[in-house]
Design a protein with these regions (language model features):
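His/Asp/Glu-rich metal-coordinating catalytic cores
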Residues: 6, 35, 44-201, 205-214
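Alpha-helix termination/capping residues and helix-transition junctions
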Residues: 30, 62-65, 166, 263-265, ...
């Protein structure tokens, strides 16, 4: 999840991520939200500063009429209940390894109930079957884990969907996956990963935000809407520069793709160069960083190109490398991609071009 920020930029991003949580709470208050559900990974790091913890707890206490329900995740090494010198707000509620239940609303025709439990190795195999809810209530269930169709032995953070179907769940609120995703659980309910409020690294690209639920206690319906809310968006931006013969042609190819993409200047971008370039072409990631770096908040350039090899020409040679290429091409067990990699490695090794060989391996490691 690292993005290799300099110190000042890293601090600014940490502040922005904290601010997004504070803004979300303010938005919830303005929307007259009665309950905020946090399904884990609130801090998502081992060491949480006193400043951050105080800001989070202080923000929750600022809205006493809005109840906050916090279920710890696998990345919450220091949970909100470990407040240090700070006082736990009365409107902040927690869960244990057995099912906890809270009444969110009992003023209408149907009660709105919240159930939640923290998954562990000790309870993961039996927790799903021990959930009992009233079928006439509107039931929200909160868990933190990876969804699977069926229970998998030995894995604590497993949400076995087959064991939660047809149990009266209207909305299954999940944490653990940091991207928004949702599907039908059964004919009655849905399961939803709202994702995290902000993407922190380039493994968390795309739109981030939160889910806003509108519960109709008369009709027994839960309407949901995903609200994009992140201050910045992260993008993986691949550009095929196949056939380019020098850095100028690479620039032109990237510039054309960049103009079409219309990426906001407030966002973070990982530019990935792909394809086969002409022999001797250096795409020059450092130069591209200088040329495009001022177009966005943060830019990282990764060169995953390879030099084109005229396999047919080399295979026709009466030489050691020609014999090597013919041998690889005749291999019926290897895929075309594997053959390309073997041919490239062999040709560079036979030519004694160890620097280029190491560079090729480095690109492959980055690609993997």
């Amino acid at each position: 999840m690292k993005t290799h920020f300099d110190t000042a930029t890293a601090k600014q991003r940490r502040d922005e991520i904290l601010d997004t949580f504070l803004r979300m709470m303010e938005r919830a208050s303005k929307e007259q939200v009665r309950a905020v559900l946090i399904a884990g990974d609130l801090y998502d790091k081992r060491n949480v500063t006193k400043r951050v913890r105080s800001a989070v707890l202080g923000c929750i206490a600022k809205y006493p009429d809005m109840q906050v329900y916090y279920l710890k995740g696998n990345h919450d090494h220091a949970g909100a209940e470990e407040a240090g010198d700070a006082k736990i707000p009365e409107n902040l509620h927690f869960f244990g390894e057995d099912w906890s239940e809270y009444v969110l609303d009992d003023s209408g025709r149907r009660k709105v109930m919240l159930y939640g439990a923290e998954l562990s190795k000790e309870n993961s195999q039996k927790l799903h079957e021990s959930l009992y809810v009233a079928q006439d209530d509107i039931n929200i269930v909160m868990l933190h884990g990876q969804t699977t169709k069926y229970m998998q032995g030995g894995k604590a953070e497993t949400v076995a969907l087959d064991r939660l179907k047809n149990r009266g769940i209207d909305y299954l609120a999940l944490g653990h996956v940091h991207a928004h995703a949702e599907e039908a659980l059964d004919k009655r309910g849905v399961w939803v990963y709202p994702g995290c409020l902000e993407g922190r690294g380039f493994d968390e690209c795309g739109v981030h935000g939160f889910m806003l639920l509108d519960v109709d206690t008369e009709k027994g319906k839960v309407e949901r809407e995903f609200i994009p809310f992140a201050s910045r968006t992260l993008h993986e931006f691949p550009v095929d520069v196949s056939g380019c013969s020098d850095a100028n042609e690479v620039f032109d190819r990237v510039y054309s793709a960049w103009e079409k993409a219309a990426i906001p200047d407030s966002d973070l971008v990982k530019l990935i160069l792909t394809g086969e370039v002409s022999e001797g072409c250096d795409p020059d990631p450092g130069l591209l960083t200088q040329q495009f770096g001022d177009k966005v908040y943060f830019l990282k350039v990764r060169d995953k190109t390879s030099e084109a090899i005229d396999t047919d020409r080399i295979a026709g040679e009466k030489s050691v490398r020609g014999a090597y290429v013919r041998m690889i091409l005749a291999d019926k067990k290897s895929s075309e991609e594997e053959k390309k990699a073997l041919i490239r490695t062999g040709i560079l090794a036979l030519a004694g071009e160890w620097d280029r060989l190491e560079e090729s391996w480095e690109k492959q490691r980055e690609a993997d």
